[in-house]
Amino acid sequence: MKNIPVVLMGCGGVGRQLLQHIVTCRSLHANQGIRLRVVGVCDSKSLVAAPDVYSMELSDNLLLEVCRVKLDSSSSLLTLNGECQVYSNSELTKKIIDIAALLGLALVDCSASSETIGVLNRVVDIGCCAVLANKKPLTSKMEDYDKLVSHPRFIRHESTVGAGLPVIASLNRLLSSGDPVHRIIGSLSGTLGYVMSEVEDGKPFSQVVKSAKSLGYTEPDPRDDLSGMDVARKALILARLLGQRLNLDSIKIESLYPEEMRPGVMSAEEFLGSGVSLLDKDIQERVHKASLNGNVLRYVCVIEGSRCEVGIQELPKDSALGRLKGSDNVLEIYSRCYFEQPLVIQGAGAGNDTTATGVLADILDLQDLFP
Protein backbone atom coordinates (compact mmCIF):
# COMPACT_ATOMS: atom_id res chain seq x y z
CA MET A 1 0.00 0.00 0.00
CA LYS A 2 1.41 3.40 -1.04
CA ASN A 3 1.04 5.94 1.78
CA ILE A 4 0.83 9.67 1.03
CA PRO A 5 1.09 11.85 4.17
CA VAL A 6 -1.01 15.02 3.87
CA VAL A 7 -1.17 18.27 5.81
CA LEU A 8 -4.08 20.56 4.89
CA MET A 9 -3.93 24.34 5.25
CA GLY A 10 -7.36 25.98 5.17
CA CYS A 11 -10.65 24.65 6.54
CA GLY A 12 -13.05 26.76 4.49
CA GLY A 13 -15.54 25.36 2.00
CA VAL A 14 -12.95 23.74 -0.28
CA GLY A 15 -10.82 22.36 2.56
CA ARG A 16 -13.80 20.79 4.32
CA GLN A 17 -15.07 19.29 1.08
CA LEU A 18 -11.62 17.82 0.40
CA LEU A 19 -11.58 16.10 3.80
CA GLN A 20 -15.03 14.67 3.11
CA HIS A 21 -13.87 13.39 -0.29
CA ILE A 22 -10.81 11.74 1.27
CA VAL A 23 -12.98 9.93 3.82
CA THR A 24 -15.65 8.81 1.33
CA CYS A 25 -13.06 7.60 -1.20
CA ARG A 26 -11.24 5.28 1.23
CA SER A 27 -12.40 2.03 -0.40
CA LEU A 28 -11.79 3.38 -3.92
CA HIS A 29 -8.24 4.42 -3.03
CA ALA A 30 -7.60 1.12 -1.21
CA ASN A 31 -8.48 -0.73 -4.42
CA GLN A 32 -5.90 1.44 -6.18
CA GLY A 33 -3.29 0.62 -3.53
CA ILE A 34 -3.21 4.16 -2.09
CA ARG A 35 -3.75 5.52 1.42
CA LEU A 36 -3.98 9.27 2.03
CA ARG A 37 -2.76 9.74 5.60
CA VAL A 38 -3.99 13.11 6.83
CA VAL A 39 -1.52 13.85 9.62
CA GLY A 40 -2.36 17.52 10.14
CA VAL A 41 -5.04 20.14 9.50
CA CYS A 42 -4.65 23.84 10.20
CA ASP A 43 -6.62 27.05 10.02
CA SER A 44 -5.22 30.55 10.51
CA LYS A 45 -5.01 30.11 14.29
CA SER A 46 -3.89 26.56 15.02
CA LEU A 47 -2.63 23.21 13.74
CA VAL A 48 -4.17 19.89 14.74
CA ALA A 49 -1.76 16.99 14.20
CA ALA A 50 -1.58 13.28 14.92
CA PRO A 51 0.22 12.54 18.23
CA ASP A 52 2.92 10.61 16.35
CA VAL A 53 2.86 11.67 12.70
CA TYR A 54 5.33 8.96 11.72
CA SER A 55 3.09 6.06 12.74
CA MET A 56 -0.36 7.61 13.22
CA GLU A 57 -2.85 9.79 11.35
CA LEU A 58 -5.94 11.81 12.21
CA SER A 59 -8.91 9.44 12.29
CA ASP A 60 -11.74 9.77 9.79
CA ASN A 61 -14.09 10.59 12.67
CA LEU A 62 -11.81 13.45 13.68
CA LEU A 63 -11.61 14.72 10.08
CA LEU A 64 -15.41 14.79 9.89
CA GLU A 65 -15.46 16.56 13.26
CA VAL A 66 -13.13 19.21 11.76
CA CYS A 67 -15.67 19.67 8.95
CA ARG A 68 -18.49 20.05 11.46
CA VAL A 69 -16.64 22.49 13.71
CA LYS A 70 -15.39 24.65 10.82
CA LEU A 71 -18.85 24.99 9.26
CA ASP A 72 -18.97 27.98 11.59
CA SER A 73 -16.06 30.06 10.30
CA SER A 74 -15.61 31.69 13.71
CA SER A 75 -15.09 28.34 15.44
CA SER A 76 -11.56 27.25 16.30
CA LEU A 77 -9.87 23.89 15.87
CA LEU A 78 -8.89 24.33 19.52
CA THR A 79 -12.38 23.10 20.46
CA LEU A 80 -11.80 19.67 18.90
CA ASN A 81 -12.03 16.57 21.03
CA GLY A 82 -10.08 13.52 19.96
CA GLU A 83 -6.67 11.91 19.79
CA CYS A 84 -4.56 14.77 18.48
CA GLN A 85 -2.04 17.44 19.38
CA VAL A 86 -2.87 21.11 18.96
CA TYR A 87 -0.28 23.77 18.15
CA SER A 88 -0.88 27.51 18.37
CA ASN A 89 -0.32 30.06 15.63
CA SER A 90 3.23 30.87 16.77
CA GLU A 91 4.29 27.21 16.44
CA LEU A 92 2.31 26.48 13.29
CA THR A 93 4.82 27.12 10.49
CA LYS A 94 7.75 25.48 12.28
CA LYS A 95 5.70 22.38 13.09
CA ILE A 96 4.51 21.98 9.47
CA ILE A 97 8.12 22.21 8.25
CA ASP A 98 9.24 19.71 10.92
CA ILE A 99 6.54 17.24 9.84
CA ALA A 100 7.46 17.77 6.18
CA ALA A 101 11.15 17.11 6.87
CA LEU A 102 10.26 13.91 8.74
CA LEU A 103 7.70 12.46 6.33
CA GLY A 104 8.20 14.00 2.88
CA LEU A 105 4.55 14.95 2.66
CA ALA A 106 2.07 16.65 0.38
CA LEU A 107 1.22 20.10 1.74
CA VAL A 108 -2.21 21.14 0.47
CA ASP A 109 -3.14 24.84 0.43
CA CYS A 110 -6.90 25.36 0.35
CA SER A 111 -6.70 28.67 2.18
CA ALA A 112 -7.27 32.10 0.67
CA SER A 113 -4.20 33.57 2.36
CA SER A 114 -1.23 35.36 0.84
CA GLU A 115 0.80 34.34 3.92
CA THR A 116 1.31 30.69 2.92
CA ILE A 117 3.98 31.38 0.29
CA GLY A 118 6.80 31.15 2.87
CA VAL A 119 5.94 27.71 4.23
CA LEU A 120 5.14 26.41 0.72
CA ASN A 121 8.57 27.49 -0.52
CA ARG A 122 10.33 25.93 2.48
CA VAL A 123 8.48 22.64 2.07
CA VAL A 124 9.17 22.40 -1.67
CA ASP A 125 12.81 23.34 -1.05
CA ILE A 126 13.30 20.26 1.17
CA GLY A 127 11.86 17.97 -1.51
CA CYS A 128 8.21 17.75 -0.49
CA CYS A 129 5.14 18.26 -2.67
CA ALA A 130 2.67 21.14 -2.71
CA VAL A 131 -0.88 21.14 -4.05
CA LEU A 132 -2.68 24.47 -4.33
CA ALA A 133 -6.24 25.64 -4.74
CA ASN A 134 -5.10 29.01 -3.35
CA LYS A 135 -4.23 31.43 -6.17
CA LYS A 136 -2.36 33.99 -4.07
CA PRO A 137 1.03 32.22 -3.76
CA LEU A 138 1.11 31.79 -7.55
CA THR A 139 0.32 35.47 -8.09
CA SER A 140 2.84 36.81 -5.58
CA LYS A 141 5.96 38.70 -6.66
CA MET A 142 8.09 36.99 -9.32
CA GLU A 143 10.92 36.16 -6.91
CA ASP A 144 8.62 34.10 -4.68
CA TYR A 145 6.85 32.56 -7.68
CA ASP A 146 10.16 31.46 -9.21
CA LYS A 147 11.13 29.69 -5.98
CA LEU A 148 7.77 27.95 -5.73
CA VAL A 149 7.82 26.55 -9.28
CA SER A 150 11.56 25.80 -9.37
CA HIS A 151 10.73 22.10 -8.81
CA PRO A 152 7.78 21.62 -11.18
CA ARG A 153 7.53 17.87 -10.53
CA PHE A 154 6.59 18.64 -6.92
CA ILE A 155 3.88 21.25 -7.64
CA ARG A 156 0.26 20.82 -8.71
CA HIS A 157 -2.25 23.68 -8.95
CA GLU A 158 -4.96 22.60 -11.38
CA SER A 159 -7.75 23.94 -9.17
CA THR A 160 -6.42 27.51 -9.19
CA VAL A 161 -7.91 28.06 -12.66
CA GLY A 162 -11.22 26.52 -13.67
CA ALA A 163 -11.75 24.52 -10.45
CA GLY A 164 -11.69 20.88 -11.62
CA LEU A 165 -11.36 21.59 -15.35
CA PRO A 166 -8.12 20.32 -16.99
CA VAL A 167 -6.83 23.79 -17.88
CA ILE A 168 -3.31 23.70 -16.42
CA ALA A 169 -2.74 20.08 -17.52
CA SER A 170 -3.85 20.84 -21.08
CA LEU A 171 -1.57 23.87 -21.31
CA ASN A 172 1.39 21.95 -19.91
CA ARG A 173 0.85 19.13 -22.43
CA LEU A 174 0.84 21.59 -25.33
CA LEU A 175 3.91 23.46 -24.10
CA SER A 176 5.95 20.36 -23.26
CA SER A 177 5.24 18.88 -26.71
CA GLY A 178 6.62 21.98 -28.44
CA ASP A 179 3.25 23.38 -29.53
CA PRO A 180 3.58 27.10 -28.70
CA VAL A 181 0.46 28.77 -27.32
CA HIS A 182 0.05 32.24 -28.81
CA ARG A 183 -3.41 33.25 -27.57
CA ILE A 184 -5.75 32.42 -24.70
CA ILE A 185 -9.18 33.95 -24.23
CA GLY A 186 -11.53 32.74 -21.55
CA SER A 187 -14.46 33.36 -19.27
CA LEU A 188 -12.98 32.26 -15.95
CA SER A 189 -15.55 33.57 -13.47
CA GLY A 190 -18.77 31.64 -13.02
CA THR A 191 -20.27 34.73 -11.41
CA LEU A 192 -19.38 37.10 -14.25
CA GLY A 193 -20.27 34.50 -16.87
CA TYR A 194 -23.74 34.26 -15.36
CA VAL A 195 -24.09 38.06 -15.11
CA MET A 196 -23.07 38.73 -18.72
CA SER A 197 -25.27 35.98 -20.20
CA GLU A 198 -28.28 37.21 -18.21
CA VAL A 199 -27.96 40.90 -19.20
CA GLU A 200 -27.77 39.69 -22.81
CA ASP A 201 -31.43 38.65 -22.41
CA GLY A 202 -32.42 42.21 -21.52
CA LYS A 203 -32.44 41.96 -17.73
CA PRO A 204 -31.13 45.00 -15.82
CA PHE A 205 -27.56 44.62 -14.55
CA SER A 206 -28.63 45.44 -10.98
CA GLN A 207 -31.33 42.78 -11.00
CA VAL A 208 -28.91 40.17 -12.32
CA VAL A 209 -26.27 41.00 -9.68
CA LYS A 210 -28.85 40.67 -6.90
CA SER A 211 -30.10 37.38 -8.37
CA ALA A 212 -26.54 36.07 -8.55
CA LYS A 213 -26.05 36.95 -4.89
CA SER A 214 -29.28 35.22 -3.84
CA LEU A 215 -28.25 32.11 -5.80
CA GLY A 216 -24.94 32.02 -3.92
CA TYR A 217 -22.84 32.75 -7.02
CA THR A 218 -21.20 35.88 -5.59
CA GLU A 219 -19.11 36.67 -2.55
CA PRO A 220 -21.02 38.28 0.36
CA ASP A 221 -19.99 41.62 -1.17
CA PRO A 222 -20.56 41.16 -4.95
CA ARG A 223 -17.93 43.80 -5.68
CA ASP A 224 -15.30 41.16 -4.84
CA ASP A 225 -16.43 39.46 -8.07
CA LEU A 226 -17.31 42.58 -10.07
CA SER A 227 -13.84 44.08 -9.51
CA GLY A 228 -12.33 41.50 -11.88
CA MET A 229 -9.45 40.82 -9.48
CA ASP A 230 -10.18 37.09 -9.18
CA VAL A 231 -10.15 36.75 -12.98
CA ALA A 232 -6.92 38.77 -13.10
CA ARG A 233 -5.23 36.33 -10.70
CA LYS A 234 -6.26 33.39 -12.89
CA ALA A 235 -5.04 35.23 -15.99
CA LEU A 236 -1.69 35.90 -14.31
CA ILE A 237 -1.27 32.21 -13.45
CA LEU A 238 -1.86 31.29 -17.10
CA ALA A 239 0.37 34.08 -18.44
CA ARG A 240 3.23 32.99 -16.18
CA LEU A 241 2.79 29.41 -17.38
CA LEU A 242 3.37 30.75 -20.89
CA GLY A 243 6.60 32.35 -19.71
CA GLN A 244 5.49 35.95 -19.23
CA ARG A 245 7.36 37.78 -16.45
CA LEU A 246 4.36 39.71 -15.18
CA ASN A 247 3.09 40.90 -11.82
CA LEU A 248 -0.53 41.50 -10.87
CA ASP A 249 -0.18 45.27 -11.20
CA SER A 250 0.94 44.79 -14.84
CA ILE A 251 -2.50 43.47 -15.84
CA LYS A 252 -5.11 45.83 -17.23
CA ILE A 253 -8.28 45.16 -15.21
CA GLU A 254 -11.74 46.52 -16.02
CA SER A 255 -13.87 46.82 -12.89
CA LEU A 256 -17.64 46.73 -13.39
CA TYR A 257 -18.17 49.52 -10.86
CA PRO A 258 -16.54 52.98 -10.61
CA GLU A 259 -14.05 54.17 -8.00
CA GLU A 260 -16.72 56.07 -6.07
CA MET A 261 -18.52 52.77 -5.39
CA ARG A 262 -15.48 50.85 -4.17
CA PRO A 263 -15.41 49.24 -0.70
CA GLY A 264 -14.29 51.78 1.88
CA VAL A 265 -16.19 54.53 0.10
CA MET A 266 -19.58 52.82 -0.19
CA SER A 267 -20.85 49.98 2.00
CA ALA A 268 -22.06 46.71 0.49
CA GLU A 269 -25.59 47.55 1.63
CA GLU A 270 -25.49 50.94 -0.10
CA PHE A 271 -24.05 49.39 -3.25
CA LEU A 272 -26.81 46.79 -3.49
CA GLY A 273 -29.50 49.20 -2.32
CA SER A 274 -28.90 52.14 -4.63
CA GLY A 275 -25.42 52.11 -6.20
CA VAL A 276 -25.62 49.13 -8.54
CA SER A 277 -28.81 50.36 -10.25
CA LEU A 278 -26.87 53.44 -11.43
CA LEU A 279 -24.81 51.09 -13.62
CA ASP A 280 -27.81 49.66 -15.49
CA LYS A 281 -27.93 52.23 -18.28
CA ASP A 282 -24.28 51.94 -19.31
CA ILE A 283 -24.36 48.13 -19.39
CA GLN A 284 -27.67 48.14 -21.29
CA GLU A 285 -26.22 50.49 -23.92
CA ARG A 286 -23.14 48.29 -24.35
CA VAL A 287 -25.30 45.17 -24.70
CA HIS A 288 -27.45 46.92 -27.33
CA LYS A 289 -24.43 48.14 -29.30
CA ALA A 290 -22.91 44.64 -29.34
CA SER A 291 -26.24 43.19 -30.46
CA LEU A 292 -26.36 45.58 -33.44
CA ASN A 293 -22.97 44.18 -34.48
CA GLY A 294 -24.25 40.61 -34.15
CA ASN A 295 -22.13 40.13 -31.04
CA VAL A 296 -22.53 39.54 -27.31
CA LEU A 297 -20.63 40.86 -24.29
CA ARG A 298 -18.49 38.55 -22.18
CA TYR A 299 -16.17 39.29 -19.27
CA VAL A 300 -12.96 37.56 -20.32
CA CYS A 301 -9.23 37.36 -19.88
CA VAL A 302 -7.08 37.80 -22.98
CA ILE A 303 -3.45 36.65 -23.05
CA GLU A 304 -1.58 37.25 -26.29
CA GLY A 305 2.11 38.01 -26.63
CA SER A 306 2.96 40.48 -23.89
CA ARG A 307 -0.70 41.49 -23.57
CA CYS A 308 -2.61 40.31 -20.51
CA GLU A 309 -5.90 41.99 -19.65
CA VAL A 310 -9.32 41.26 -18.22
CA GLY A 311 -12.58 43.03 -18.98
CA ILE A 312 -15.70 43.13 -21.16
CA GLN A 313 -15.19 42.17 -24.81
CA GLU A 314 -17.57 41.97 -27.78
CA LEU A 315 -17.50 38.43 -29.15
CA PRO A 316 -19.32 36.59 -31.96
CA LYS A 317 -22.56 34.95 -30.86
CA ASP A 318 -21.62 31.68 -32.55
CA SER A 319 -18.24 31.30 -30.79
CA ALA A 320 -17.77 28.99 -27.79
CA LEU A 321 -17.64 32.06 -25.54
CA GLY A 322 -20.60 33.68 -27.28
CA ARG A 323 -22.74 30.60 -26.70
CA LEU A 324 -21.84 30.50 -23.01
CA LYS A 325 -24.82 30.37 -20.66
CA GLY A 326 -25.03 30.21 -16.90
CA SER A 327 -22.01 29.92 -14.64
CA ASP A 328 -19.81 27.61 -16.75
CA ASN A 329 -16.20 28.50 -17.52
CA VAL A 330 -14.99 28.45 -21.14
CA LEU A 331 -11.40 28.73 -22.29
CA GLU A 332 -10.21 28.96 -25.92
CA ILE A 333 -6.54 28.11 -26.48
CA TYR A 334 -4.88 28.97 -29.81
CA SER A 335 -1.57 27.33 -30.70
CA ARG A 336 0.27 26.08 -33.77
CA CYS A 337 -1.82 22.90 -33.83
CA TYR A 338 -5.01 24.68 -32.75
CA PHE A 339 -4.67 27.71 -35.02
CA GLU A 340 -7.99 28.12 -36.83
CA GLN A 341 -10.16 26.08 -34.48
CA PRO A 342 -9.05 26.58 -30.86
CA LEU A 343 -8.83 23.94 -28.18
CA VAL A 344 -11.96 24.63 -26.11
CA ILE A 345 -12.28 23.62 -22.47
CA GLN A 346 -15.73 24.10 -20.94
CA GLY A 347 -17.58 23.05 -17.81
CA ALA A 348 -18.35 23.96 -14.23
CA GLY A 349 -15.54 26.22 -13.13
CA ALA A 350 -16.60 27.00 -9.59
CA GLY A 351 -18.03 25.37 -6.48
CA ASN A 352 -16.44 23.73 -3.45
CA ASP A 353 -17.20 20.20 -4.64
CA THR A 354 -15.70 20.68 -8.11
CA THR A 355 -12.64 22.49 -6.75
CA ALA A 356 -11.99 19.92 -4.01
CA THR A 357 -12.28 17.10 -6.55
CA GLY A 358 -9.58 18.82 -8.61
CA VAL A 359 -7.36 19.13 -5.53
CA LEU A 360 -7.81 15.45 -4.70
CA ALA A 361 -6.92 14.48 -8.28
CA ASP A 362 -3.76 16.61 -8.00
CA ILE A 363 -2.70 14.84 -4.79
CA LEU A 364 -3.18 11.45 -6.43
CA ASP A 365 -1.25 12.64 -9.50
CA LEU A 366 1.83 12.95 -7.25
CA GLN A 367 1.67 9.34 -6.02
CA ASP A 368 4.72 8.18 -7.99
CA LEU A 369 6.88 10.51 -5.89
CA PHE A 370 5.99 8.57 -2.74
CA PRO A 371 7.38 5.15 -1.70
Where do the PLM segments sit?
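Hydrophobic residues within beta-strands of alpha/beta enzymes
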Residues: 130-131, 184
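A generic secondary-structure micro-motif detector
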Residues: 109-110, 134-135, 225, 276
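NAD(P)-dependent dehydrogenase/reductase Rossmann-like domain
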Residues: 1-8, 12-26, 32, 37-40, ...
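Rossmann-fold NAD(P)-binding glycine/threonine-rich loop
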Residues: 113-126, 135-174
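Glycine-enriched alpha-helix->loop->beta-strand junction motifs that scaffold or abut catalytic
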Residues: 126-130, 190
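N-terminal glycine-/serine-/threonine-rich beta1-alpha1-beta2 phosphate-ribose binding loop
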Residues: 1-125
